[in-house]
Design a protein with these regions (language model features):
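N-terminal helix-loop segment corresponding to the beta1-alpha1 unit
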Residues: 1-182, 186-192, 198, 227
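Glycine-rich beta-alpha junction loops
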Residues: 39, 130-131, 203-208, 245, ...
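Aromatic-enriched alpha-helical interface/lid elements that frame and gate functional surfaces
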Residues: 236-313
């Protein structure tokens, strides 16, 4: 039995952010009913290859990654019959999640204002690119565009290179996780008070929130954050290093670990050097320290360094 056993979720979402959110609710034991277009289904059913072959059928790997623990129902929401069925399901659900553009559910007679009349306890979550209100609210919200507009691409990529998107649709993932936690809080509120609520989750807002220390640094300094490639803006050493047979990743999070590292590589004096003794000093003298470490690490295989660093607890 999961924490959400007995909770019913009505899932009107497609693609990634919404389906991830509802899948996690299903993982916790909720009964998730996924409403799909009666002709084409979720868009991602057609996204491939790769395909999983089973019982003579092909299933999109993309679709499968965020749609476990769900029961699918095909409805034509443009028809009276489809809308009536959706309303009946909503009347007996605890949670509804949708990711149409603002106003999309209202066109089907399924807005929060309409459904709360038949189910006052309903937790109704809307996931969009830019929220229910505001100058950009009518824009579609694709992950790639959100990564660009939020500034995430500006800080991703090589130091002297072009901005890059992250290798997965991270803005979608972040929005789905924010929606999941907001729904749990709203569900708790509904169980205490009997009151449902409408949750407004925007990919843009949640991606801005996920910039965390980079956004804080920019607000405090007033400067546009540069790209650091695989290095860290505020911690040194914290990047890949080239060993004799390839690269390995090294993350030294504090001065104590740096002293351990220096002892391990046979240069305990470096940890007493004023240029490197503290993390702010190491950040200020990043290039000099990285050059010294490169000269040490290139002498042995990557696996040997990784084993030694792990044994030292770094």
């Amino acid at each position: 039995m999961g924490a959400l056993t007995g909770i019913r979720v009505l899932d009107f979402t497609r693609v990634l952010a919404g389906p991830l959110c509802t899948m996690l609710l299903g993982d916790m034991g909720a009964d998730v009913i996924k409403i799909e277009d009666d002709v084409r289904g979720d868009d991602t059913r057609q996204w491939g290859p790769p395909w999983l072959e089973k019982n003579g059928q092909q299933f999109s790997a993309y679709y499968l990654c965020v749609n476990r623990n769900k029961r699918s129902v095909a409805l034509n929401l443009k028809s009276r019959a489809g809308q009536d069925t959706a309303r009946t399901l909503a009347a007996h659900s605890d949670i509804l999640v949708e990711n149409f553009k603002p106003g999309g559910m209202r066109a089907f007679g399924l807005s929060y204002e309409e459904l709360r009349q038949i189910n006052p306890r309903l937790v109704y979550a809307s996931i969009t690119g830019f929220g229910q209100t505001g100058a950009y609210s009518d824009r579609p919200g694709y992950d790639f565009v959100i990564q660009a507009m939020s500034g995430l691409m500006s800080i991703t990529g090589e130091v002297d290179g072009a901005p890059h998107k992250v290798g997965v649709a991270i803005s979608d993932v972040i929005a789905g996780l924010f929606a999941h936690s907001a729904i749990l809080a709203a569900l708790f509120h509904a169980h205490r008070t009997g009151e449902g609520q409408h949750l407004d989750i925007a990919l843009y807002d949640t991606q801005i929130a996920a910039l965390v220390n980079v956004a804080s640094n920019a607000l405090v300094s007033g400067e546009t954050p540069p790209r650091y490639g695989n290095a860290h803006a505020s911690i040194v050493p914290y990047q890949p290093f080239r060993a004799a047979d390839g690269e390995f990743a090294l993350a030294v999070g504090n001065d104590g670990q740096f002293r351990q590292l220096c002892a391990l590589i046979g240069h305990p004096d470096w940890s007493a050097d004023p240029r490197f003794a503290t993390n702010p000093a190491r950040v200020a003298n990043r290039a000099a320290l990285v050059d010294l470490l490169d000269g040490v690490f290139c002498a042995r295989p990557a696996r040997a360094w990784v084993d030694e660093v792990l044994r030292a607890g770094i």
